[in-house]
Amino acid sequence: MTIAFQLAVFALIATSSILLISVPVVFASPDGWSSNKNIVFSGTSLWLGLVFLVGILNSLIS
């Protein structure tokens, strides 16, 4: 169970870092939002799911 928690936290940190870089780049590019909004929404959904997963796993471990 601890390994799953550690992997979920690592995935959350990695996803946060990727979104931290990619979202401003998408908004700054001339036609970026209209062509990449599905990717941004998918990344945001993944991030939100990982937040809940880490919370659930944290409550099971402690």
From Swiss-Prot:
One GO BP annotation of this record: photosystem II stabilization
Keyword Hydrolase: no
Compartments in which it is found: Plastid, Chloroplast thylakoid membrane
One GO term describing the cellular component: chloroplast thylakoid membrane
Annotated TM spans: 8-28, 41-61
Superkingdom of this protein's organism: Eukaryota
Keywords: Chloroplast, Membrane, Photosynthesis, Photosystem II, Plastid, Reaction center, Thylakoid, Transmembrane, Transmembrane helix
Purpose of the protein: May control the interaction of photosystem II (PSII) cores with the light-harvesting antenna, regulates electron flow through the 2 photosystem reaction centers. PSII is a light-driven water plastoquinone oxidoreductase, using light energy to abstract electrons from H(2)O, generating a proton gradient subsequently used for ATP formation.
Database matches in NCBIfam families: PS_II_psbZ (TIGR03043)
Similarity section: Belongs to the PsbZ family.
PANTHER family, per database record: PHOTOSYSTEM II REACTION CENTER PROTEIN Z
Protein name (record): Photosystem II reaction center protein Z
